[in-house]
Amino acid sequence: MLLKTPQTKIALALGGGAARGWSHIGVLRALDEDGIEIGMIAGTSIGALVGGCYLAGKLDELEDFARSLTMRRMVGFLDFVIGGGGLLGGMRLSKRMREHLSDIQIEDLDRPFTAVATEISTGHEVWIHSGSLSTAIHASYALPGIFQPVDCNGRTLVDGALVNPVPVS
């Protein structure tokens, strides 16, 4: 008789890194295929996007979106703004994300999730582990100078990779 030992859950820290971050999708798929249970995810920037979509059950949709990106489609998401702390408003991307994540709240996910962002006024690291999933993700990837900062829970936040590129703490 073979005794099965209890499965150990792992915690994942998914880092930033722009386009390289899409590789997190493959990592999550490989862990699932090998039966490795993910107990929680912390993500920064694109790592927050991929991790949040995974826990929300939207990884297939995110992968389809990533695979469909062409230069023309990417340009279509650019919403240039004058003033406000970034070249891009980021609202077209944010709207697309909200369409797929609807009103999902972080605390309603079946496992803990934390998105890491940076408070622009202090430079401090901020862990977002409650509230709107799409807002938390948007704040975590709002690269200063490119995207406008995001108001979240009374704070003005930008990309978490500025203070914690891979949130292992």
Q: Which residue ranges define each predicted feature?
A:
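Patatin-like phospholipase
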Residues: 1-44, 52-169
